[in-house]
Amino acid sequence: MTHDSTFRLNGMVRLLHEGVHSERPPHDRLADPFPADHAAGSALWNGLPEAAFTIPGTSTACPYLEQFFTAPVSQTGNTPETASVPAPVYLCGSATSSMDVARALAAHGQLPVWGSVLALSQRSGRGQLGRNWVSPEGNVYAALRLPRSHPFTGTAAAPAVGGLIAEALTHMGFDVHMKWPNDLLRREEQEEGPGWCKVGGILLEERPLPPHRETPAENLLVAGIGLNLVSSPPAALMRAQRAVPAGLLSSATKSNVSPLSVAGLWMRLVSRIFFCYVEEIDAKGKNAWRSLAERHLAFLGQTVLLTDGPDEQERHTGILEGLDDFGGLRLRNRKGTNSFLSGSLRLDRPPMQP
């Protein structure tokens, strides 16, 4: 990883140096202790300013060390991008999952909306339908708390979040598309010609939170986000019915995007997601999310196969026309155009050669 010198940071980072335990008996450990010296030399933090860990201790239900970044004024006349993180970013060591840590923090009133957790690695990471997510060090394993407002409160939530993330990554220089409803793909040259590979995934979970002090009980909505930066699951661990092979977000030999530390990339991504939400969705009205998601929708205009039901026995083939207002996939065939709210999507045949 290289030093994150191409952009500046504004925001608060909190290191969970003593680890995190569940709020309920038997208080299982959710994240291992992550001392400052360990964190500073880890893939999670490598490349960011060393001064970030000359920080005071803070005593809370989930103790952390805190650093507030203020982007310095440029003395050279250059104006690098400033990543302004809208809420605290928590860094933790090896965890059961970043989503577990996020729920524990939220239960203690320590994770506001747009706050996030970034784990060094995961022991029990999970993907769609509860599938195990391979989680060694060096990749992004994050959880982001979302507002419980449109479009995140209904069936459009998954493609809306996917569109936001794809838009943010594209702005950062990564050519990423969303495979409905919650996979992140990029194009890749393969032996048989141009193809797709999966570089990340998104999992949404909404669960009730217990009341905290004066705060009434509420539901917690969290997006689990995984991105393959340095490693991807081997083919033997991928399910047989996978739509595309696994791959990396970028390759040093095939991309002009400068590599970032894991934490640096995540902070920049959160900054872009929040900016995009405010400018592209919140400010433009009810269905603005749909235009954004369709802009990055993989397989658009191509013949696809949608499978659903037990053992994926239900099969629907058609031209992918886009999304409906509820986040459903719109397929057109000789019988007309229909919308589907669930299923696994793949190309029905290889894409045409250019």
Which positions does each model-derived feature cover?
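N-terminal lobe of the biotin/lipoate ligase/transferase fold
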Residues: M1-G163, E167, G193
